[in-house]
């Protein structure tokens, strides 16, 4: 039996933003030769690794700010930076973020809050495809509410409405609700640069409507034809790894 296709928030948002980028990222293997290392990805991956270790209740080796800074140094990724100076500036900024976030987490640790998982892969069968999503952290709050925490290393602010309107956060809530059907579920984005958080929760009706929308979008992605992937100029073309590929297509005009 053939495996059911899988779609993730990143795949879905990529297709909605640019079907051509989806093609080169996930469908046509030629695209991988055009991918370049990104400094923001290296920076974010490093911070995620530190917080994964710190919040993993099974990892007793990272419990203090000093431990977290040690893991930061060990985990640092230097790929994608334009110069050594740019990398050093980012390294210093990341170190300050780790100190601030971990200090705050230790000082404000809430009674009754338990981390259930870090870097947890959630799945749900949505009929023609399987929806998957990897959450940075999954907490159980004192009242039994399941909280999904998503770290954002590039944001300088975050609001409740942004969390509510975020496709990935809605996907995570849908997936978490499948795993914990009798629990309330909430989503939180943690903007690491400013150490600020915002949370939102979709109602059962909102989740039902969202699930129907995602199924429809998924069907569109899975049934996409060659013409659907036709490259068309748009603002996000500037700086895209695949611009050279799209320019080779006579339809790109």
Model-predicted segments: where are they?
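Metal-dependent nuclease catalytic regions and adjoining charged, substrate-binding loops involved
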Residues: 6-7, 143, 174-253
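C-terminal, charged and often intrinsically disordered regions of DNA end-processing helicases
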Residues: 1-41
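Active-site-adjacent bridging/hinge elements
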Residues: 19-27, 142-150, 215
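Non-catalytic protein-protein interaction segments used by genome-maintenance enzymes to assemble
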Residues: 117-176
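A non-catalytic, helix-rich entry segment at domain boundaries
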Residues: 49-119
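Short, polar/flexible loop-turn hinges at active-site or ligand-entry regions and domain interfaces
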Residues: 30-38, 57-62, 83, 158-159, ...
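Hydrophobic (often cysteine-bearing) scaffold residues that line and stabilize catalytic clefts
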Residues: 39, 43, 47, 90, ...
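Short acidic (Asp/Glu) and glycine-rich catalytic loops that position anionic groups and cofactors
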Residues: 24-31, 48-49, 74, 149-153, ...
């Amino acid at each position: 039996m053939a495996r059911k296709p899988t779609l993730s928030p990143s795949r879905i948002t990529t297709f909605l933003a640019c079907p051509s980028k989806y093609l080169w990222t996930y469908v046509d293997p030629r695209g991988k030769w055009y991918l370049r290392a990104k400094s923001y990805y290296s920076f974010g991956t490093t911070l995620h690794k530190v917080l994964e270790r710190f919040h993993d209740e099974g990892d007793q080796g990272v419990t203090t700010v000093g431990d977290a800074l040690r893991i930061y140094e060990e985990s640092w990724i230097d790929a994608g930076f334009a110069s050594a100076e740019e990398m050093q500036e980012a390294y210093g900024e990341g170190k300050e973020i780790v100190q601030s976030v971990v200090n705050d987490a230790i000082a404000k640790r809430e009674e009754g809050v338990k981390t259930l998982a870090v870097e947890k892969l959630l799945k749900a069968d949505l009929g023609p495809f399987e929806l998957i999503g990897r959450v940075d952290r999954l907490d159980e709050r004192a009242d039994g509410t399941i909280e999904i925490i998503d770290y954002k290393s590039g944001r300088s602010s975050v609001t409740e409405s942004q969390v509510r309107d975020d496709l990935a956060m809605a996907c995570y809530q849908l997936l978490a609700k499948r795993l914990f059907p009798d629990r309330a579920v909430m989503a939180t984005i943690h903007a690491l640069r400013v150490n600020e958080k915002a949370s939102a929760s979709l109602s059962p009706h909102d989740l039902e409507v969202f699930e129907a929308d995602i199924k429809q979008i998924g069907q569109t992605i899975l049934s996409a034809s060659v013409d659907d992937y036709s490259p068309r100029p748009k603002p996000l073309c500037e700086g895209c790894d695949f611009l050279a590929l799209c320019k080779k297509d006579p339809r790109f005009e």
